[in-house]
Amino acid sequence: MKNLNNIKNILFDCDGVLYEDLDAVFGQVSKKMTQYISNKLNVNLKKAKELQTSYFHKYNTSLNGLMIHHKVDPKDFLKFVHDIDLSCLNKNDILRNELINLNLKKYVFTNGSREHAENIIRQLGIEDLFDDIFDIVDAKYFPKPDPNNYDLMLKKFQIDPKETLYIEDIAKNLSIAKKLGTTTVWLINEEQWGKKDSDKEFIDYKIKNVSLFLKEIRLLKSA
């Protein structure tokens, strides 16, 4: 691992990064999205799922496509799809300890809502360890990897991208960050949409476990 002494800030994507069981949580969100689309557009669940998937791949979030093509109220959408059961998530003491011992500014950087991110980190028992959250509303609904999203995030957090490390499970979302000088970290996964572009040079590190990686950073910076 290269020298990371210049790193002062760390960005965490939320879903799929702060917890491992993506299906248990985001699987619920996905089903709620399908139901929302079916209800709003008066289509069957199969057609709704097709639109959801198509918009996600074309516009980086299903919400973005729904706003463009169907003038969906984003706040109504976010409130509905994030009303889920998080009892499947347990407190993560290992992650908590590593976050506590890592002397860096810590931020959540998500394409979801602030409320959803707050619910996740509260369920994990790490809600008091983050300096701030940047969500899709802060991004004016420009989803990652839209350059506007990154510009707005940097302005809100008032951080230097060259002093920042960013952990993400969707590889393509790291591309713009790398151009800005951010140290990029891809959390390895087998989701097709997650690993697309994972072979590109804009990824500095590929990791299998967030807590272990944070421990490595801590040990490196204290050496």
Q: Where are these predicted regions, by residue range?
A:
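Generic anion/oxyanion-binding catalytic loop in active/binding sites
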Residues: 22, 37, 55, 106, ...
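Asp-based, Mg2+/Mn2+-dependent phosphohydrolase catalytic module
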Residues: 1-7, 100, 114, 118-223
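Secondary-structure boundary/capping signal
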Residues: 44-45, 74, 106, 128-130, ...
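Conserved phosphate-coupling serine/threonine residues in phosphotransfer and NTP-handling enzymes
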Residues: 110-112
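Catalytic-core regions built around general acid/base machinery
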Residues: 94-103
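N-terminal helical cap/lid subdomain that shapes the substrate entry/recognition surface
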Residues: 3-94, 115
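Proline-centered loop/turn at the N-terminus of a beta-strand
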Residues: 105-107, 183
